[in-house]
Amino acid sequence: MLDKMANENWPVYGEITGPVVMIGFGSIGRGTLPLIERHFKFDKSRMTVLDPRDTDRKLLDERGIAFVQEAVTENNYKKLLTPLLTNGGGQGFCVNLSVDTGSVDLMRLCRKLGVLYIDTVVEPWLGFYFDAKADNASRTNYALREAMIKEKHDKPGGATVVSTCGANPGMVSWFVKQALVNLATDLGLEFSEPAQEDREGWAKLMKKAGVKGIHIAERDTQRTKKPKPMDVFWNTWSVEGFISEGLQPAELGWGTHEKWMPKNGKKHKHGSKAAIYLEQPGANTRVRSWCPTPGAQYGLLVTHNEAISIADFFTVRSKKGKVQYRPTCHYAYHPSNDAMLSLDEMFGAAGKPQPVHHVLDENELVDGVDELGVLLYGHDKNAYWYGSQLSLAEARKLAPYQNATGMQVTSAVLAGMVWALENPDAGIVEADEMDYKRCLDVQSPYLGPVKGYYTDWTPLDRRPGLFPEDLDRSDPWQFRNILVR
């Protein structure tokens, strides 16, 4: 089935003049393909997709797109990718949507070749996440991001490389800016919106608005037609991706308002020092959060790049470089019920993953919404959630081969690609540094309702209950009150 939904009204945003190379053809690659076809002019005879598995090869065969059934590895990436990315004239585009592909090495290669590049995570080569010889600090996303930042500082400028631009990390950084502008307006603050490149101005506005922290607050209510059997891991997006990040240490951007740190909390000795990590797996760490549909909920403090990049971006420093303000920032993720059950089984078996991994596609799911937004809290209006409430039904109508979760990612990849084509020599950028308005303009047709909600909920609501708790009643929005212990 080719893209039956391609109608004349979808805008074509630009032309990719060189070859297109997509690394990975799992749930996100499959969903991104029709969006690339719909919104860009490109030479299909110079598009190549690489994946070690050929599960969905027929989608490529019917389009006449070349498929290479091979994993991109540390040993073969230069030899494998260089001819594909330099095939014919024009500027190529490398779209990395795979696990176990060393992002920083691929960025370096693309910049050397003058090729545009985008990914959804700073991904290491195979073996990093489960390296028993490595200490936990070196298995963090903080360490991965620092490697990317070093590359950026060592070699500024050059062909645009968009780092970590999916739904989250990625889109949520654009939501944070829109939410901040909405909040500052509703608070009646006198302000003019900072320019895209004015990081300091954005940080000062966040401080002025009195925001103590930000949850990337998500609830996935997509349900399957049939119940999950035992000994399989079901998820609405990459199972390998979820397991690897779920078994990394929990990580959070660490705000200046925090008065208490868990005993197993650890600071970093080098770099921005914008984040801390806990000596426990993120997918087995719960926090109290809030989304519009369920209201109060438990979320998982799974590590994500945006928890670090957003906290870093909105840091206010003195002239001497001393940190004067920083918001706490972390993921608070309630995945689909089947994924929660899968995690429960996995951690029950001491973290041993189930032998069968399966991504639930749009045909196996019956209904539900992926409600993904940012919760700005601790200000004079208490808390404000702003985000996408995309339903499975709407995702099915908008584009083929994806559920609601996938579409929030693929549409962010699309927006990042558009921005890169329009700004081809920006060097390495994170989503926080891009033009959030332009990116959301491109992405919003795929996001369902994008709305803001104020709430009077705090993590101290209905607490303590029947049992004594260690709470900080002077400030409801302390991490002490948010972390489930």
UniProtKB/Swiss-Prot annotation:
Its cofactor is NAD(+). One of its GO terms (molecular function) is homospermidine synthase (spermidine-specific) activity. It catalyses: 2 putrescine = sym-homospermidine + NH4(+); putrescine + spermidine = sym-homospermidine + propane-1,3-diamine. Its EC number is 2.5.1.44. InterPro entries: Homospermid_syn-like_C, Sacchrp_dh-like_C, Sacchrp_dh_NADP-bd. Keywords: NAD, Transferase. Involved in the NAD(+)-dependent synthesis of the polyamine homospermidine from putrescine. Belongs to the saccharopine dehydrogenase family. This is Homospermidine synthase. It comes from Mesorhizobium japonicum (strain LMG 29417 / CECT 9101 / MAFF 303099) (Mesorhizobium loti (strain MAFF 303099)). The gene is hss.
